[in-house]
Amino acid sequence: MSKVIGIDLGTTNSCVAVLEGGEPKVIANAEGNRTTPSVVAFKNGERQVGEVAKRQSITNPNTIMSIKRHMGTDYKVEIEGKDYTPQEVSAIILQHLKSYAESYLGETVSKAVITVPAYFNDAERQATKDAGKIAGLEVERIINEPTAAALAYGLDKTDEDQTILVYDLGGGTFDVSILELGDGVFEVRSTAGDNRLGGDDFDQVIIDHLVSEFKKENGIDLSKDKMALQRLKDAAEKAKKDLSGVSSTQISLPFITAGEAGPLHLELTLTRAKFEELSSHLVERTMGPVRQALQDAGLSASEIDKVILVGGSTRIPAVQEAIKKETGKEAHKGVNPDEVVALGAAIQGGVITGDVKDVVLLDVTPLSLGIETMGGVFTKLIDRNTTIPTSKSQVFSTAADNQTAVDIHVLQGERPMSADNKTLGRFQLTDIPPAPRGVPQIEVSFDIDKNGIVNVRAKDLGTGKEQNITIKSSSGLSDEEIERMVKEAEENADADAKKKEEIEVRNEADQLVFQTEKTLKDLEGKVDEEQVKKANDAKDALKAAIEKNEFEEIKAKKDELQTIVQELSMKLYEEAAKAQQAQGGANAEGKADDNVVDAEYEEVNDDQNKK
């Protein structure tokens, strides 16, 4: 079976790993970094992903960041007159990760395990699966990020029984999961979280502080200036990272804007104490889900054996202090918070291919599932933290006499009223025989698969008529849309490959021009003038093609010059061989001289003996 890669598709950074020799290994990108910024940019019709896209984000308004925050919604971003869905943008990132995984493995990759925040609802999970499909990946499994982290942590500890709490604070989402490990079984006991809380919010409090201080001093609101705002964002992210290691940092942004008197600069010292004051409400917000997860698991903090920190934002000292205070445990430092999720996904890939044996993963559904019943009430069929895969059925009836159709409104959430929960989808069961209300028997069945994706079935027990759907939220893509996007993604991949080939050919041509000039210098006076002229003419023709930037012409002229240079190089080697032969003859004649040297050496020894 072909390799199944593990992908941590993050809000701010993404990571890809693979199982090699039974061990998960992170694959570095082309720049040599082990994580890749989840940033996509469009410039002159060309797509840029990762480091290169992030670097030019200040000057390029067509840059998309933190798209994961919009997964499962009908949000669209317009770039150069075209609307992109979160699934399409995520697919561009996935394609990039896939391409450098293929370069590393030396084979085509078509299967992946992709991680999602544990608190992602059905629409968000489905959107992630669709993004994988658009990127040309068969998503073998969607697994929760904290569960993946637990897999990576516990793979070599399967003989120990322990209860672990995974605290996952990423760039845009926050999750807490409590798992029990033992005998190779990873069982999730409970999960809780907040999909609108992450490192981006910690950056934002610094940005707001900088904007406020600058306005106080200069009377100018930087939040209205797009380019200044992007510079502030970069500076805030850097300051946040610095403050994990030092107690104060200098933020210096020269020429941030211009006032009446001329250019203005932003200079400010931010202390760790001030940052902790600004972000204290965010740290406290993470404690709610921690308490909720403990309560749902029926455990006290003292019953937790290990605390695993996941996500770059867990490096913030105030976060570490808060979790230590809440659980009474020092966090386990043996895992890399940026890579552990991708490593866990790669292990799950190994479980699927059969390379990892005796590991069983039992995950849960993060939110309760049910339908709307009379009076707008939300009636739960499957409670949150139920182990998946699972299915549950319940019999309902009609609310009015002679009702021939029922609307099934499927929801996910914890609130008692339907209006306060997330709509997953609606469908109708029709052709119910007219009867007094309360008589028809309609069985509604929910089925959640191992990816946390929901299927719902409604059946009239009287007639046996059945209607079922895989939930497609209002933001979900139709099969036709996905197919179109897959096609576009493939076309873009071909265009990217062609562009890459053009750059490589151009670089080779430049190198060949330089090489030719060097070779001609070395051959000066050693070959016919006519051959030198022929090479010079071919070199000038290639230079002209490079200047015109005509790909096919560059290719043809490059091949032409290459042939001439090879002939010249052969001449050079022939000359060298002749010179060597001549040298060899001289050496043979000089053997008598060698004897003289020996005699001279003996003579010295004789002198020494006389002494």
Swiss-Prot record:
Biased composition range(s): Acidic residues: 595-611
Protein name: Chaperone protein DnaK
Annotated family: Belongs to the heat shock protein 70 family.
Molecular function terms from GO: ATP binding; ATP hydrolysis activity; ATP-dependent protein folding chaperone; heat shock protein binding; protein folding chaperone; unfolded protein binding
GO biological process: chaperone cofactor-dependent protein refolding; protein refolding
Region span, Disordered: 579-611
Induction: By heat shock.
Keywords for this protein: ATP-binding, Chaperone, Cytoplasm, Nucleotide-binding, Phosphoprotein, Secreted, Stress response
Described function: Acts as a chaperone.
Subcellular location: Cytoplasm; Secreted
